[in-house]
Amino acid sequence: GEICDGYARADARVVVVHKENTGVSDTRNQAIARARGTFLQFVDSDDWLTADATKLMVRAAEETGCDMVIADFYRVVGEMVSRKGDIDADQVIGREAFVGFMMENPADYYYGVLWNKLYRRSLVEAHGIRMDAKLSWCEDFLFNLEYVRYATTFYALRTPVYYYVKTKGSLVNQKISFARTVEMKLAMFECYNDFFKHVLDEDAYERKRLQVYHFLVDAAKDGFV
C-alpha cells in the first residue's frame, strides 16, 4: 500500500483505494465506478505490463476508432517466458468476424480474459456493464460477452504488451463445492447461449448451435482463469 500511495503523491492521475478484500469482481466494479478516463485497462496482481503497453493500445484505439483493442502477450511459467503469438498482423475486425472467432475457440485467452484488452469506458457506462460478483469463475468472460454485444469493431494488436504469470487457476484447484461448480457452469452456459442468440440472426444461430453447446465442455479448460 505504501508504494501505491507514493505513486499517488507523485502523480495526481494515480488514485489509490484502500479497502477490505471483497473479491476481484467487486474490486474491479469499484474501480470502474471511480474511473474518469476515456479507456479502461485491467492488470492482475501477479502480472506486469510492458513499458509502452498503454500507449500502444490507446494509440490503436484512437487511430482506428475501435471499441476494443486486443493485444498479444507473453506467458510466464516459472523462469520461462514465451510469446503467445496467435496474432499474425495488426488489423481491424468487425463484430460478425469477431463473434465467429469466439465461437471457434471460446476458451481462448483472447476472448475470456480482461488483461490483454482496452475498453471504451463510455460504452461500459452507457450499458451498465459490470462484473458479476456472485461468480468466482468465468466472470471475465461474462463481462466480455456483455461488452461485445454493444461493440462494433475490434483491433488486434500484434505487439505483445502484457506478461501473464501462468498459475493453476481452474475450478479443480479452487475450493468450490461440486454443486456450486455445476451451478456456475450452467449459468455461464445460459449467458453464452443468450449472447449468440442476440448477436446472430435465427438462421445463423441454428447453423452454429452445436458450436455454442460445445462451450459447456470447453469452459472447463484452464484458459479462462
Label each region the model flagged.
Residues 102, 203, 216:
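Active-site anion-handling motifs in enzyme catalytic cores
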Residues 196-200, 223-224:
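Secondary-structure edge/capping motif, primarily at the C-terminal ends of alpha-helices
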Residues 198-208:
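Flexible helix-coil transition and linker loops at the boundaries of alpha-helical arrays
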